[in-house]
A protein has these predicted regions:
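Conserved helicase RecA-like core
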Residues: 1-130
């Protein structure tokens, strides 16, 4: 297996959840993080565009403003979502792998992999290498 390197300060943790409870754990993690660290930014990666939209709706339902970014959104909306997140207007970005490639996001405090990517190891590393 090819050796991969991540950022030295990266703290990686895994929480395996039953699929039917995944969203409840996600909400609890996001709400707790925002309560303890209100200025922290969070990216939630999802496997599909549909799941990304649903998680964005879930965040809105629990009172967490978020930006949603995936390939099915028009470019203008993607640009607007990314700008809102980068400027701090929203502290949560819900995205597919479209956000793990080549975007310049200077400070992300928490990356949550809502659904494990198809090529797990490589995708997770790309998502964490800002």
């Amino acid at each position: 297996m090819e050796e991969k390197h991540t950022v030295a300060e990266l703290d990686q943790r895994f929480l395996l959840t039953p699929p039917e409870a995944r969203d409840a754990y996600l909400v609890q993690l996001v709400l707790t993080t925002r309560e303890e660290h209100p200025k922290h930014s969070i990216i939630i990666f999802c496997k599909t565009c549909r799941t990304t939209e649903l998680v964005g709706l879930l965040m809105a339902k629990v009172g967490v403003g978020s930006s949603v970014l995936h390939s099915m959104k028009p470019q203008k909306e993607r640009t607007s979502s990314l700008a809102a997140f980068k400027s701090g207007q929203t502290k949560v970005l819900v995205a597919t792998d479209v956000a793990s490639r080549g975007l310049d996001i200077p400070q992300v405090n928490l990356v949550i992999n809502h659904s494990v990517p198809r090529d797990s190891v490589v995708s997770v590393l790309k998502r964490c290498m800002w």
